[in-house]
Amino acid sequence: MAAKIRKGDKVIVLTGRDKGRTGEVFAVRPSEGRALVRGVNMVKRHQKQTPQQEGGIISKESPIHLSNLALLDKDGKPTRVGFKIGKDGTKVRIAKSSGAEIDG
């Protein structure tokens, strides 16, 4: 299946405790159908001390299911993603709301 949401995309959270928050995708896990969004879905984890790292309670991002994310178009509005074949034969992503091509 083609990736509708990719690393570097600006997205908005549709459901859950972070509903309405926006951020940039910095990792996608296609096998799990989840993505990590910077500054969204933060959880606290207890980190054991190591020689290189200090121990304590740290905050880090937790993965969000792709169905709970929507891509933001150039105007900053959430949109669904479609695909079309470009003039040179490559598959490009398009915003369903405006029909504009999505860079990526």
Swiss-Prot record:
GO terms for biological process: translation. It comes from Afipia carboxidovorans (strain ATCC 49405 / DSM 1227 / KCTC 32145 / OM5) (Oligotropha carboxidovorans). SMART domains: KOW. This is Large ribosomal subunit protein uL24. HAMAP family: Ribosomal_uL24_B. The keyword Oxidoreductase does not apply. Keywords: Ribonucleoprotein, Ribosomal protein, RNA-binding, rRNA-binding. One of two assembly initiator proteins, it binds directly to the 5'-end of the 23S rRNA, where it nucleates assembly of the 50S subunit. One of the proteins that surrounds the polypeptide exit tunnel on the outside of the subunit. Pfam families: KOW, ribosomal_L24. Belongs to the universal ribosomal protein uL24 family. The gene is rplX.
